[in-house]
């Protein structure tokens, strides 16, 4: 299976506030990083109690893959992330629109196709995974099968952009029942070599067109 590795502009964008809506619905994040090799809070929706107010944290990770060499819609594909430290968050892969070639900026925090403030976006976004990721290895690759929409975009777009987002609170817009440990970590493309880089592994489609020749 060929591999397409994430570009080095991948990374995370975080937002924090004293209210859930203030963190989750920000247009611009409060911090970002597209140069680290790995992070412990790559995807996060957590709450830290405090006085006079608690602090809510939302972190999303963004990736892009050069798919310009994919001519035909793949027969199948998997996105793979090497885990790091915690693995408590339930995750979705969704289509995104962040800039490429300039590094992630805090202004990319809400660059999710179909996303919107103050709403449950599970039905609004373009989902790329076949199923929700509910388990996360912190010492190996986490393999996530991609759906037909992702396969079509691999063939139809020169760059496949996506966001790894927490499902239960962030994507669903639900600030209830949050805790201090709901986050998952992973490695990014800035790690030396490609051993732990995020990647898409895919099965190519063979062109089965049949040509009939004739002598005239």
Please give the residue ranges for each predicted region.
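A short beta-strand-loop element at or near the start of a globular domain
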Residues: 23-86
